[in-house]
């Protein structure tokens, strides 16, 4: 997908990986970048606007844990203004295995609900034009960091959901792919809690191993957007971008 002149909605576009990715997207010249985030950051929005004055950057407060109905209402406001949206990026995520319910609500249910809501506008069975979804998942969806099993499971669920969306594209007209960052230097990983305190030093131990910067991740994220491969499972690790092959162990045959 050529980013230039496109309309993009980015959920959690002001976070660690999210903000650097927003910067890279703005540099590529979309027509509109609509950022939905829980906490407003006027300085960050101003920076994005200054980076490329030709791009219209707007912000709406949004908590992904709200109902599908509330999300649909917000999206209607956006669609009424823009008329069309080309790409939805679902990027909300937390890493704190003390907060079991919220981890699942943000990392998985929020992605499902936001996706479900946008289908009201995109689903070709309802006369919609189709669209593209990029879901930020994680390499922990491939193989868990077992000290944070709740986080890892939530990302595995988001990845499975995305893979199903891609297979449903012939029915809905909506394509999808997953963005799976490796360990990236963000505030998310500098301090976080393991499940039941099974490893109090989990963050420290994790950062003893090679990582990547948010800029490296963001630059590869934009490459994945441009590649626009339905069903792709992108691994963004140590500054590299790789489409991985998913091993099939079972098939429903339906």
UniProtKB/Swiss-Prot annotation:
Substrate binds at residue 138. Its EC number is 1.1.1.1. Belongs to the short-chain dehydrogenases/reductases (SDR) family. The active site is at residue 151. Keywords: NAD, Oxidoreductase. It catalyses: a primary alcohol + NAD(+) = an aldehyde + NADH + H(+); a secondary alcohol + NAD(+) = a ketone + NADH + H(+). GO terms for cellular component: cytoplasm. It comes from Drosophila mulleri. One of its GO terms (biological process) is alcohol metabolic process. One of its GO terms (molecular function) is alcohol dehydrogenase (NAD+) activity. This is Alcohol dehydrogenase 2. The gene is Adh2. It is an enzyme of class 1 (oxidoreductase). NAD(+) binds at residues 10-33.
